[in-house]
Amino acid sequence: MEVIQVKKSLNLKGEVKIDGAKNSALPIIAASLLGTEPIILEDVPKLKDVSIILKVLEELGSKVTYLDKNKVEIDSSNVNNSVTPHELMNKMRASFLVMGPLLTRLGQTKTYLPGGCAIGSRPVDLHLKGFKALGAEIESTDEKIEAIAKDGLIGGEIYLDFPSVGATQNIMMAATMAKGETVIENAAKEPEIVDLASFLNKLGAKVRGAGTSTIRIVGVDKLHGARHTIIPDRIEAATFMVASAITRGDVTVKNCISSHIMPIIAKLREVGCEVIENEDEDSIRVIATGRLKGTKIKTLPYPGFPTDVQAQFMALMTVCKGQSSVEETVFENRFMHVEQLQKMGAAIATEGNEASIAGVDSLQGATVKSTDLRAGAALILAGLVADGTTNVTDIYHIDRGYDDIVSKFKKLGANIERIEIED
């Protein structure tokens, strides 16, 4: 089987360029179904999840052309298939984001329930609540969902019980061609929401308030083409910032927007890192010397501490001096990495959605399993400071969210390889 093998690599040093954000690219690619003219997207990350959603679009009738490694042209002018492919939908959760665009453009869609990271229930009921509020009729079974709006969608008011990113995005896209005004209350505020709104407006949509808890969309008759650059991936940036901290390194993260990751910057300073922001160059330098001290984090919807960096920060906490704690409030069942870190000698106790960590002097290399995307990243970070050799298995999870993570770490001086080992 293929593993990522990591050997102790202290004092990482150098620069790393961050790719476009996966969590922005996926909804924007889905939204490309709305345009009746070609769309060009730049800084599209080369990831497994991205290739899956592009295949979904091709199955629906879009023409997808790579102009270079990170530039894609999507022509959805001839899309007329409203049924999503079952085998592709089953591979990735974000594939559900095509439902809103198909519903508003074609008046109907049949889709299969999605797969992806097994983090808690992550239900799609908020998406469906939004579609119903816009006048769609929904029929669902355990496997598939059908939505129909015979006479088109009609603007409405939607209150989200939780500021779900996916639901906010799906409802925004569905509302772009609904008759009248749609108001989403308690909307997600993530930078990826703002990026999607920016893209939709380039297509000719009328979206206001993205980045606040109230988003207003006035429906238009049709949307056209556009050129758009995906924002940098704040989670990838945070991962390499934590890598600098855990290895007592000096790493400059390029192509990142510091205002998108303020909680990470604040917490790294709290544990004892020097963090230098250079907004003119969109870069952040993280310098760590000596042993860092423990801290507390509580995951929250944006602009709070991101749940997608919880596992990586916990890896850092395992070797900080003193006690640390984590409270996970966004997703249930998001401590699957704890057992793997414990195999490496981490002193972690969990109760419900809380974890307490007693910092240890050193971790030990082990064979550990990447249980989800961010857990995989956390185990690589732990391997960088563990004595001996760490083999991270199930690395397909890591490939879903990081493009060429091994070569990026190598450039910083890490002893890391993708290799085949016997099962």
From Swiss-Prot:
Q: Pathway involvement?
A: Cell wall biogenesis; peptidoglycan biosynthesis
Q: Which residues carry this modification: 2-(S-cysteinyl)pyruvic acid O-phosphothioketal?
A: 117
Q: Which InterPro entries match?
A: Enolpyruvate_Tfrase_dom, Enolpyruvate_Tfrase_sf, MurA_subfamily, RNA3'P_cycl/enolpyr_Trfase_a/b, UDP_GlcNAc_COvinyl_MurA
- Sorted alphabetically, which Pfam families does this protein's record hold? EPSP_synthase (PF00275)
Any GO MF annotation of the entry: UDP-N-acetylglucosamine 1-carboxyvinyltransferase activity
Q: Where does UDP-N-acetyl-alpha-D-glucosamine bind?
A: 93, 122-126, 308, 330
Q: Catalytic activity, per the record?
A: phosphoenolpyruvate + UDP-N-acetyl-alpha-D-glucosamine = UDP-N-acetyl-3-O-(1-carboxyvinyl)-alpha-D-glucosamine + phosphate
Q: Which E.C. number(s) belong to this protein?
A: 2.5.1.7
- What highest taxon heads this organism's lineage? Bacteria
> What does the UniProt keyword field contain?
Cell cycle, Cell division, Cell shape, Cell wall biogenesis/degradation, Cytoplasm, Peptidoglycan synthesis, Pyruvate, Transferase
Chief location: cytoplasm
Q: Which family does it belong to?
A: Belongs to the EPSP synthase family. MurA subfamily.
Protein name as catalogued: UDP-N-acetylglucosamine 1-carboxyvinyltransferase
Q: What species was this sequence derived from?
A: Finegoldia magna (strain ATCC 29328 / DSM 20472 / WAL 2508)
Q: Which gene encodes it?
A: murA
